[in-house]
């Protein structure tokens, strides 16, 4: 296969803006129309928004791990809080030590700085091997060093507050939000209730909740046992640590509600621990999230193919899996550079490939330009549901209607059958019963036939078979050629020499000249003979007239 030319769009922020401005000049168009393609076995399964991103925004979240109890309930919760505090220190001290080692590696100036940095990273990695991702994480950790130091200056005030969420701004170079999942629990359970609780019940409630949170902490930091501080935390881990308070930071950083679910699903929001203070039980995490640009006039359209019936057997259409359309331009979209969610595609760069005129014409609705590859496998998908209806190849499988009862037949030469509630309310296919609620309106093309010229060979076995047929044809041609050669061998070569041919040509020319002269001479003699006949006839008539005149006298 030859290499394909591609359209590449990198994603520096300025270029992102330029791309969006350029595309905004294109008039919006509807998505790829799948109605004329469905009966040809090409099904448009859905569209997704196309976004480009670059990781550029950061913010800090300071997690208050140890809650402040109300004064009148401190004694009741003292025992579980002390046990919880000891467990926290044991669990997170390796993380804090790793962070300090990496951050202190930049204290040396000159050429020793890089060496100490790599040494600190290697020292925190099992087997002494640091990956590129770990080095990147360590570099980000060092860049956040000053911010972490400023947060530690405010640790006493952060630890003393009873607020579950509040902003920390003094001396910080980026947005920081202090949150406390356990503080939220204490506030909800004890500070905002007038109900009197006995000490045993308070101890039990606090102990159970702290144990649950410890379990979450262990789950979050379990992968960091071998390389503390160098493993990124996922958005799920951040939510486990901060609870619903995480939304406050994301909103402050500019993440809208319409994008939040897609960004969470994409995994583009990550966090790196930047500090841990065992005295106040504060855990600082730098959160990185992308700057996302939505290309409003560009969408990704997903295509699926069914095995259709042709006179050459079963075949599937040769079309891309994903295409994108901007204005009147349709190109294949490479999704290997993207992160996919239910509704969106997030690209670090956009790569498209131009399509051949035949495929372009096919996807534009000209089904006679579609090309198909033979697929005679028994497991090839012969049916697909679409908006409450079914597109099925009833030549490959038995299409049974339960309401009204009957077998749905497919006409000869018809590629697939479009089955909706107008033709069948309850549809049974391969043991699966479906109640149809959709309808194929008049805009859907039906009764499409695939011509023999549209079916080509692409599979290895089919190509081998075709090559065998070609070899047989070549063998037959060689036999005919050999027979012709044997006949030519019987020809007298002397008679076909150059001099003999020249002699034949000269004699032929002389014969033609003689023939022409003979013909001219014959014509002349005939003309002369006719003239003599006319003269004799005139003389005879004249003599007869004279004799008649003499007789009368």
Curated annotation (Swiss-Prot):
**Gene behind the chain:** F
Please indicate which residues carry the site annotation Cleavage: 116-117
Which species? Newcastle disease virus (strain Queensland/66) (NDV)
Write out the annotated subcellular location.
Answer: Virion membrane; Host cell membrane
GO CC, alphabetical: host cell plasma membrane; membrane; viral envelope; virion membrane
Protein name listed in UniProt: Fusion glycoprotein F0
Q: Name one Pfam family in it.
A: Fusion_gly
What keywords are annotated for this sequence in UniProt?
Coiled coil, Disulfide bond, Fusion of virus membrane with host cell membrane, Fusion of virus membrane with host membrane, Glycoprotein, Host cell membrane, Host membrane, Lipoprotein, Membrane, Palmitate, Signal, Transmembrane, Transmembrane helix, Viral envelope protein, Viral penetration into host cytoplasm, Virion, Virus entry into host cell
Region Fusion peptide: which residues?
117-141
- Identify the glycosylated residues: 85, 191, 366, 447, 471
